Amino acid sequence: MTQGAPWKSILLFTVPMLIGNIAQQLYSTVDSVVVGKYIGDNALSAVGSSLPILNMLLVLFIGISTGATIMASQFFGSKSRNDLSYTIGNSITVTLIACAALIAVAAPFIRPLLTLLNTPTDPVVEGIEDYTVLDACADYLSICLFGIAGMAFYNILGGIIRGLGDSVSALLYLLVATVVNIFLDILFVASFGLGVAGVAWATIIAQFIASFLCLIKIIRMREHFDFAPKYMKPVGHYVKTIIRLGLPSGLTQAIFSSAMIIVQSLTNQFGVQFIAANIVIMRVDGFAMMPNFSFGTALTTYAGQNVGAGRYDRVIKGAKQGTLMAVGFSVVLTLAILLFGKPLMGIFTDTEELVEMSYRLMFILAFGYIAMAVTQSLSGIMRGAGDTMTPMWISIITSVIIRVPLAYIISYLTVTEDLPHGIPQCIQISLLVSWVAGALLTTVFYARGKWKTKAIKSN
């Protein structure tokens, strides 16, 4: 990505990743469709209530993946074979240790946390009172936790492959995982009647398959680095650099997930149907965000390789061109959601009232995707250059200082006799405001240019 027209390099790298992200979102969507159609809206709300906690469990590995991707791209750009070898080996070791530690620490707290968050105790299936939404959430999260290594290694190994400039292979492996996940969803839920637990098992099995394929690909890319046990022995410089670069990104996701968990407690007060509506719009929102996330990740690799090669002129050109392309995609998707929102919501449920509620909530969020295009693109540039702290602080400001308090303030100010918890739209309005604030802050800090001084030093 250090040669040729910047926009072309970015677009060619982004498109396979965008398809892969859409595929990943597709099998999350299939989870919801299968649950909503074959089990019911209460089961759909169980999956929805679980997602903020599951995202919180994954933030550690998102951080490791970010650190490994930035290091791999910069060392690949500077052709530092030894540094690249230790980066890959140490990333695998750190991931193994992190998986074991997370399972040991998190397992005892799943059910208490769900109770603390006011997770509904309505029955998942009407007439079966002894299996509630809370029980289904606990089952779903427990299975995902004990299979977390599959999700973790796909994130880390896929990130390294992209850092080396190959976004096509990661796409192919994700497509395989998507097909497997869809097949197993239908088999476990519709045929075997395993319920919400069946959805969790399908996801875990598919992720392990994708991780295994990524590992094989990395072993086959040894023309760029050496892959041997000695490189997996922890070396202080590389472990510290992975943590230094990855910790802010992991904390960013942790902060965002924590905000979602806090807001989930407010969401749960509005009842099972509102929770189900939120899971529907989260799935549609996931698709709408894909171009933004894809351009952001592509620009991280692009910036990393060009910073490694000392080409800051290309980094600046790529930032402008990549952001414009991301904004263009977001405009198209916003119009599509506004025009075709109701049919999209109808894919997930046959309940007309739920479709109407989901569309009204989605209508609010649709206007924020352009702002997120700017945030993700410029944050990607800063991360790729080695500045992972600035995006973290922006996330703290937008998620903790703006979004969470604003949601509760709007809820409090709109309380009436008919709406004892205020208007449910408080969740989406606060999120929209935080997105716009994030875009403004990211633009200001990118323009200041301190990210240009953060390149990684070789050992």
Regions found by a protein language model. Name each.
Residues 12-31, 143, 177, 206-210, ...:
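Transmembrane helical elements of multi-pass membrane transporters/channels
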Residues 1-14, 72-147, 191-246, 303-368, ...:
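Short alpha-helical transmembrane segments in multi-pass integral membrane proteins
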Residues 17, 21, 33, 70, ...:
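Transmembrane alpha-helix boundary and packing residues in multipass membrane permease domains
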Residues 65, 143-162, 170-178, 199-214, ...:
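Short runs within selected transmembrane alpha-helices of multi-pass transporters and secretion channels
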Residues 35-55, 132-139, 196-197, 238-245, ...:
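Interfacial/gating helices of multi-pass transporter permease domains
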